């Protein structure tokens, strides 16, 4: 998932993300760059549309088995370890 996350993190309005598996599907958990969202004066609906555009753009860059089938936005930054890596285990069972 790290390769997919690196690509997703480079897309517009993404501050950080985490890719998890839900059944057979990959789901992106995304913390948007709210500073950029506010600068662009985007509504929640426009933010959702941009994230869907990001999902489609990402899926065009990766193999079919790496494609993201959905995403969920997180308002808060993900919890991190002292080394600043995301505590993945906290989000493994995230509801989509």
Region locations from a protein language model:
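Adenylate-forming
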Residues: 1-7, 36-46, 63-68, 85
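A short, flexible beta-alpha/helix-coil linker loop
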Residues: 21, 33-38, 76-80
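Short alpha-helical interface patches
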Residues: 34-41, 92-96
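Conserved C-terminal "lid"/linker of ANL adenylate-forming enzymes
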Residues: 16, 24, 55-96
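Short alpha-helical basic/polar micro-motif
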Residues: 6, 12, 82
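Well-ordered, non-membrane alpha-helical segments in soluble/globular domains
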Residues: 44-55
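C-terminal boundary motif of the adenylate-forming
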Residues: 10-34, 59-60
């Amino acid at each position: 998932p790290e390769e997919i996350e690196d690509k997703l993190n480079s897309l517009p309005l993404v501050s950080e993300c985490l890719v998890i598996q839900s059944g057979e599907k990959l789901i992106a958990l995304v913390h948007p760059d709210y500073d950029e969202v506010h600068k662009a004066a985007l509504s929640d609906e426009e933010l959702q549309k941009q994230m869907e555009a990001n999902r489609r753009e990402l899926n065009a860059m990766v193999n079919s088995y790496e494609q993201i089938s959905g995403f969920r936005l997180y308002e808060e930054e993900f919890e991190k370890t002292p080394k600043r890596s995301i505590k993945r285990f906290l989000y493994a069972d995230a509801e989509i």
